[in-house]
Amino acid sequence: MTGSIWAGSIWAIVPAAGRGTRFGGPLPKQYLQAGGQPLMAYTLMALAAHPALAGIVVAIAPDDADWPGWTAVQSKPVLTCLGGATRAASVLAGVLALPESVRADDFVLVHDAARPNLALADLDRLLEIGRGDPVGAILAAPVRDTLKRAGDDGGIDGTEPRERLWRALTPQLFRRHQLIRGLTEASAAGVDVTDEAMAMERMGLRPLLVEGAEDNFKVTTPADLARFEFELARRGIAVDADALEAPAVNAQSNARNVATQLATVSYGNDAT
């Protein structure tokens, strides 16, 4: 469906305000180098490769000195906004920073900044299936390993059935107004949702699971980075630096716009 009538109709949010403390080192993991480019370059290029993508909003940390200042990827606009202390806060900021042309019931993608190995076929399938559902869908992978439940003493308390268990991946696809309501309500309740589907679940909604490739992994450890570098070499992947345009959109200006929207947005009953 890459040549579908959806061309240029979907915006993506990339939360990139995290520090990646599990990885260690001075750089946030999304800026680690692989093949001569930051990891996030591959992430943005993978999204921009789909003709349905209209543009990307990247939520960055207020003190981010590493953001390369991209304003477009493959001629598709890249906007920035200031993210929050949690993933959910950054995603909400990104949703509120979307252009006015994005309507309340339009679908929006959310994708991890440090998940650079997204396949075009997976994104295509997610859009095809997710847009046919009133709620949306997420990429996910069936759990294949045997799962053990641990006791407080480190011993095994039991084995969990895996037949209906899936690992949540990204991108995740939901309507703009449902994202706003779900993330806002979770925050108000003091619940730190770890992905957007969890916010939907809290509202009683049931997103679809779309099976994605196992190699759509998130880079969280040095071993993950080495694995991605191996994939780059094996497949001969390179980023065309000319496809990444700068100077940067002013993040402080976007942040003021987000603050204004946070103060004035009305949620109503349109998110169910």
Curated annotation (Swiss-Prot):
The GO terms this record gives for MF are: 2-C-methyl-D-erythritol 4-phosphate cytidylyltransferase activity
Would the keyword Calcium turn up in this protein's UniProt record? no
- UniProt site (Positions MEP for the nucleophilic attack): 162, 218
Provide the top EC class.
transferase
Annotated site location: Transition state stabilizer: 22, 29
**Classification via HAMAP family:** IspD
- Specify the protein name: 2-C-methyl-D-erythritol 4-phosphate cytidylyltransferase
